[in-house]
UniProtKB/Swiss-Prot annotation:
It catalyses: phosphoenolpyruvate + UDP-N-acetyl-alpha-D-glucosamine = UDP-N-acetyl-3-O-(1-carboxyvinyl)-alpha-D-glucosamine + phosphate. Keywords: Cell cycle, Cell division, Cell shape, Cell wall biogenesis/degradation, Cytoplasm, Peptidoglycan synthesis, Pyruvate, Transferase. The keyword Cell cycle applies. It holds the Pfam family EPSP_synthase. Belongs to the EPSP synthase family. MurA subfamily. The lineage of its organism: Bacteria, Pseudomonadati, Pseudomonadota, Alphaproteobacteria, Caulobacterales. CDD domains: UdpNAET (cd01555). Phosphoenolpyruvate binds at K22, N23. The active site is at C120 (proton donor). This is UDP-N-acetylglucosamine 1-carboxyvinyltransferase. One of its GO terms (biological process) is peptidoglycan biosynthetic process.
Amino acid sequence: MDRIAIIGGAQLNGTIPVSGAKNSAIKLMAASLLTDEPLRLTNMPRLADTRFLGKLLTRLGVQVTESDGSDGQQTLLHAPEITSGFAPYDLVRQMRASFNVLGPLVARSGQAKVSLPGGCTIGARPVDLHLQAIEALGAKIDLHEGYVYAQAPRGLKGAEIRFPFVSVGATEHAMLAAVLADGVSVIHNAACEPELVDLQECLNAMGAKVEGAGTPTVTITGVPRLHGATHAVIPDRIEMGTYAVAAAMAGGEVRLSNARPGLIDALLDKLKEAGASVEETADGCIIRRNGQRLTAVDIETAPFPGFATDLQAQFMALMTTAKGESRIRETIFENRFMHAPELMRLGADISVSGGEARVRGVDQLEGAQVMATDLRASVSLVIAGLVARGETTVSRIYHLDRGFERLEEKLGACGAQVRRIKGDGEAEL
């Protein structure tokens, strides 16, 4: 099993291109099931999660072709027909977002059998809201032996969908299912994340009639069919925020290109409050910290445009060496402080009580062997390793490979001493 080793102490100086958003790309890939014409996605990240979903889509009848073009990395998806409505456990378990093939399959072919998902083990994260949305659109849902059986032989029907609480995944799933439904669907209490706007833009380019994404109310007027399209995936705001934190942690000057700083205003405001410099550019931003120690600041996670829960672990790593005490409140997921004990192995002073962590900054972290527990926790350990004295080795980095493209290459190009150690012990520089 691969590991990543970091020798701390080097500043970061250079340019990091931000990849396309994983959380958007995987939903856009699922949209290919809705049409018999090709869907071309540009600015596509190459990640374990997109590979997993590509395998699943291939099984369902989608022809998946990756290439490099003038618009960067591209993926062409073409499903002239759905050859199977069965999404097995061995594929769906690898990534919970692959469950979102259920709605498109039912919308286009009238039936599906999809395994209940796996993925990051952060809290309960039930799929109940997804199923309620598909049922509201007229599908008959049965659960049996870990599988969801969904049928709508006469097609889906437009409906009012009211979520009791905000769910990004359920909102996306409802949008994917409703675009081919007969009539008008209205999603109330919809999530407002920018990835939903990206999904709306792609679906509309394919001929759908979706409006309101990015607001709490999304309206979808069903159409008989969708056609092919070309769509550029939005930049990954979590990757952007992660490298912004890494630059503030290690010091130096890092330019983030192909980025949209407005998507992470909540984080950038906190970086400035802590003492880092943030300068917006035509295609991104520049993060600087020139030697001065950062000051501890408090954060509380919240739905967009608030502080993203997917950046909480990274910010906790940043606060481990800040001057003073910071309080970090997690309001989105329970059990999302699993990275805290691993940061403590590096010398961090952290105490956790319920949904709040207190981080008392220390003068110096010390390198050690640590273990990634989930996707965002894994990169927080890499960030801490950038300043830890000596070598930090992070194991179980398959979590990292799910969401960060060429991380060692991007950090290494800015001066970080980071390398991948292959499962047989051989380092990959």
